[in-house]
Every structure is written in structure tokens, then in C-alpha cells.
């Protein structure tokens, strides 16, 4: 608990002095005022996040956290639970969607086992993935708490520790996840923290039909009624209806914010983790970059609660960190506008009136 408390205490808002300096330069770039729109907004944020007019973003790390969920027993996913471990191996071997798009972004992918149901020790022993394993999957949240409060703290602190471990190797973090049925706890978290109903926060996940979606909503409603999570206590929400990988991602976000490093939030599950981070440390939102708007129904509700506009809208619903990977090149573009584009004075170009 001490690491969580000290990390939260270290999270400060963006550097307003550097933001003012960056704004002054961006206002004078050789184009009609703010003609590159939200890319300039992003450049401004990067300066404020890092406290630098030369924000570093070259060393990129996507942390894909894996975990299983007891609520999968309720039939809320189109895929069996063993797919979690199979896809972890696929990512580790470079064959997954995130593996491919990370190569495009010149980013490294680090998979972390937070609590998969299967044995991933061979991948851990070979150095292909890291283990911060808490248990072989959460308990079924439809029947009781998904985890203990102590396990919730452990998951958060594992994510913080990952951020600290890679602080010297990464300028820019991205979030990713792998866990069959993890849209179900994510919908529960969004319903609680974005002040929505279970129906409003629940989509079709891996591609279930409408009848199964209605069943999924009923399972989430049962979990909320059974556990009565306190929406004003992010730790209670995580313990009662969360997941180990979701807690790990929330901790990663807190850790990045404490380090003043930008972190790109991937899709629906990652955004649920971001809501938990916001609940625990509101200033952590200052370091989040929303990668994309997925087609998962509750994602827009979560983004609105964070006050974030996503960079991309490509009808994604995969997770893994795929949207975060694609957004990394936009982040680089924003940084380069701040550091490489000439001002009117530098280029001897006349300004408009």
C-alpha cells in the first residue's frame, strides 16, 4: 500500500510554465493559426507532461497485461478461456495484431502475466514475458468479489513497479491487455465510474449476438447488486468487479503519471483502467492520451468522463494495445511540429493579418 500512496502523492498537474512557452512557439509556426488543430493540442500536452520543449517520445513501450476472469463461467464471451494463454504466446512470438502494429510504430511490446488461468511459466522462464501473477484468474464477480482488497492493491502496485522498472528505457508508454471476458468487468467499472447503467456500458465484446449481450448485461447487473461497489472508492470498485490486468494497467498509468511520462490509453478495457486511475489520482488524467474510439458501446462514456478526445476512430475492438501502437506515430508527429517546424520569424515568412 505504501508504494501506491507514495506514487499517487507524486502525481502533479502538467507544467503550466512550459505549456505557455510551447503555446507561444506553436502560435508562431508557419501556417494559419492552429491550422493543424488537435495535433498541436497534443504537442502542447506533450510539453506540459514532460516539462520540456523537446519532449522525448522516441523510446516506446507498450505494456500488454494478461489476466483471466471467473465471470467467464457465466458465458459472457464468444471465446473459451484458454485463448488468453494462447494469445499471450502469440504476442510473445510476434504473431499478433499488436506485434505487427508495434513494429510499424517502432515500439517494444512487454507482456505481463497478471493472472492468467493457464500456466505461462515456460514463457516467463525463457524471458519472453514477465510475471506479476496474483492468482490464476479472478473469482466470479457475479457470485461475490472478484478479488480481495489486498489483491487489488497488489495489482495496482505491480503496474506501478512495471512503470518504474522501465522508466529508464521508455519515454512513451502504451497500454494493452489480453483476457477473455475482460469487457465484462470493464463494463461494470464504466457503469460505476461514468455514472451509467450496465446496459449503457455494455457492448458485444468479442462479437457476441444481441441475446448474449442482454445476458451479459444481466450478469453485470447481478455483480453490481451482489457486491455493491462504492463508486467513490476506486480500490473498492477494482476489488469487487475488476480484473488483475485492469488493476495492473491502472497502476501503470499512475506510475507513468508520477514519472511525468505520457501514456497512450488503448481501447475499452484500458479506458476502464484509466477511470480507476482517475478515481485514485485525478491529476493522472493530465498524462493520458486517448488512442482511439472503439466500437465497444461504453467506450465513449468512459472517454467523456476522462475528458478525452481520441486521436483515431477506426472501428477497432481488439485491444492488445493495437490502437496505442498506431497512435504513437501521431505522437511523434506532434512532437516534431513543436521541435522542427519553423516559426514565421525563423523562416522569414510574412504573417497574415
UniProtKB/Swiss-Prot annotation:
CDD domains: DMB-PRT_CobT. It catalyses: 5,6-dimethylbenzimidazole + nicotinate beta-D-ribonucleotide = alpha-ribazole 5'-phosphate + nicotinate + H(+). Pathway: Nucleoside biosynthesis; alpha-ribazole biosynthesis; alpha-ribazole from 5,6-dimethylbenzimidazole: step 1/2. It comes from the Bacteria. The active site is at 320 (proton acceptor). It holds the Pfam family DBI_PRT. InterPro entries: Nict_dMeBzImd_PRibTrfase (IPR003200), Nict_dMeBzImd_PRibTrfase_bact (IPR017846), Nict_dMeBzImd_PRibTrfase_N (IPR023195), Nict_dMeBzImd_PRibTrfase_sf (IPR036087). Keywords: Cobalamin biosynthesis, Glycosyltransferase, Transferase. Transmembrane segments: none annotated. Its EC number is 2.4.2.21. The keyword Nucleotide-binding does not apply. GO terms for biological process: cobalamin biosynthetic process. The keyword Transmembrane helix does not apply. One of its GO terms (molecular function) is nicotinate-nucleotide-dimethylbenzimidazole phosphoribosyltransferase activity. Belongs to the CobT family. Catalyzes the synthesis of alpha-ribazole-5'-phosphate from nicotinate mononucleotide (NAMN) and 5,6-dimethylbenzimidazole (DMB). This is Nicotinate-nucleotide--dimethylbenzimidazole phosphoribosyltransferase. The gene is cobT.
Amino acid at each position: 500500500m505504501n508504494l501506491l500512496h507514495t506514487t499517487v502523492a507524486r502525481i502533479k498537474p502538467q507544467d503550466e510554465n512550459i505549456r505557455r512557452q510551447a503555446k507561444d512557439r506553436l502560435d508562431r509556426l508557419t501556417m494559419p493559426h492552429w491550422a493543424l488543430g488537435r495535433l498541436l493540442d497534443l504537442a502542447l500536452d506533450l510539453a506540459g507532461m514532460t516539462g520540456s520543449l523537446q519532449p522525448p517520445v522516441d523510446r516506446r513501450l507498450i505494456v500488454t497485461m494478461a489476466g483471466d476472469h471467473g465471470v467467464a463461467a457465466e458465458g459472457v464471451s464468444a471465446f473459451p478461456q484458454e485463448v488468453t494463454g494462447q494469445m499471450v504466446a502469440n504476442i510473445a512470438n510476434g504473431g499478433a495484431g499488436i506485434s505487427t502494429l508495434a513494429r510499424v510504430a517502432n515500439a517494444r511490446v512487454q507482456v505481463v502475466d497478471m493472472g492468467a488461468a493457464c500456466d505461462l511459466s515456460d514463457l516467463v522462464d525463457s524471458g519472453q514475458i514477465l510475471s506479476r501473477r496474483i492468482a490464476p484468474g479472478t473469482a466470479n464477480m457475479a457470485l461475490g468479489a472478484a478479488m480481495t482488497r489486498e489483491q487489488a492493491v497488489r495489482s495496482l502496485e505491480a503496474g506501478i513497479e512495471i512503470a518504474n522498472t522501465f522508466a529508464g528505457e521508455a519515454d512513451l508508454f502504451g497500454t494493452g491487455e489480453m483476457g477473455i471476458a475482460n469487457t465484462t468487468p470493464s463494463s461494470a467499472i464504466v457503469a460505476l465510474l461514468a455514472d451509467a447503467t450496465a446496459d449503457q456500458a455494455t457492448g458485444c465484446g468479442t462479437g457476441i449476438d444481441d441475446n448474449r449481450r442482454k445476458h451479459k448485461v444481466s450478469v453485470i447487473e447481478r455483480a453490481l447488486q451482489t457486491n455493491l461497489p462504492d463508486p467513490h472508492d476506486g480500490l473498492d470498485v477494482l476489488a469487487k468487479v475488476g480484473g488483475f490486468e485492469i488493476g495492473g494497467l491502472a497502476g501503470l498509468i499512475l506510475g507513468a503519471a508520477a514519472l511525468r511520462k505520457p501514456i497512450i490509453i488503448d481501447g475499452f478495457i484500458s479506458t476502464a483502467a484509466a477511470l480507476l486511475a482517475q478515481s485514485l489520482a485525478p491529476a493522472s488524467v493530465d498524462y493520458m492520451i486517448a488512442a482511439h474510439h472503439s466500437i465497444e458501446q461504453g467506450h465513449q462514456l468512459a472517454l467523456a468522463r476522462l475528458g478525452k478526445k481520441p486521436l483515431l476512430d477506426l472501428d477497432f475492438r481488439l485491444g492488445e494495445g493495437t490502437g496505442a501502437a498506431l497512435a504513437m506515430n501521431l505522437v511523434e508527429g506532434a512532437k516534431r511540429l513543436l521541435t522542427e517546424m519553423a516559426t514565421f520569424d525563423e523562416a522569414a515568412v510574412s504573417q497574415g493579418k
